[in-house]
Each structure stands twice: as C-alpha cells, then as structure tokens.
Swiss-Prot record:
GO terms for biological process: ribosomal small subunit assembly; translation. It comes from Spinacia oleracea. Component of the chloroplast ribosome (chloro-ribosome), a dedicated translation machinery responsible for the synthesis of chloroplast genome-encoded proteins, including proteins of the transcription and translation machinery and components of the photosynthetic apparatus. It is found in: Plastid, Chloroplast. GO terms for cellular component: chloroplast; mitochondrial small ribosomal subunit. Coiled coil: none annotated. This is Small ribosomal subunit protein uS19c. Disulfide bonds: none annotated. Keywords: Chloroplast, Plastid, Ribonucleoprotein, Ribosomal protein, RNA-binding, rRNA-binding. InterPro entries: Ribosomal_uS19, Ribosomal_uS19_bac-type, Ribosomal_uS19_CS, Ribosomal_uS19_SF. Gene3D superfamilies: 30s Ribosomal Protein S19, Chain A.
Length: 92
C-alpha cells in the first residue's frame, strides 16, 4: 500500500541537512547513510549517496528517474548465488 498523499515523503532529518548544506556550497561529495527508508526527493539529484546494505556502503548516483523511490531499493541486501547443485554421489 502506498503512503497517503496527505503526508509528506519520509526523508531522514540528518540526510536532508547534509544535502541542503552541500547544495548551498554547490559541492558534490559522497554522503554516507544507513537510512534505507528515506524517499528520494528532487533536491538529491546529482549527489552520490552511499547506502548501507547490511555489510558495506554502496555508492549510488541519484538521477531524476529515481525520484519517488526509496534509497533501499538501489542497494540489494541479499546475494542469491543459485540453488545447490544436485550431488548424487554423496547420496550413495
């Protein structure tokens, strides 16, 4: 279910402050965050945000097509390596 339109999109306060500070200085640097639930807003476009996936921070460059999505959607947490091979020799 989607978020109510009466409410504003969720963006962590510390992340919003960092982005606004960089926009005032007109600088681009990697912003490290653990806030995967934050929604991408238009002021984030052009910044590189390192999103935590549970083990490391993955740097993601924010484009205009990502607006409205959550940061966590772009940093996968699971690494599926495929199903186990069918080992018939060990069954004998």
């Amino acid at each position: 279910m989607t978020r109510s339109l009466k409410k504003n999109p969720f963006v962590a306060n510390h992340l919003l402050r960092k982005i606004e500070k960089l926009n005032k200085k007109a600088e681009k640097e990697i912003i490290v965050t653990w806030s995967r639930a934050s929604t991408i807003i238009p002021t984030m476009i052009g910044h590189t945000i390192a999103i935590h996936n549970g083990r490391e921070h993955l740097p993601i460059y924010i484009t205009d097509r990502m607006v409205g999505h959550k940061l966590g959607e772009f940093a996968p947490t699971l690494n599926f390596r495929g199903h186990a091979k069918n080992d018939n020799k060990s069954r004998r």
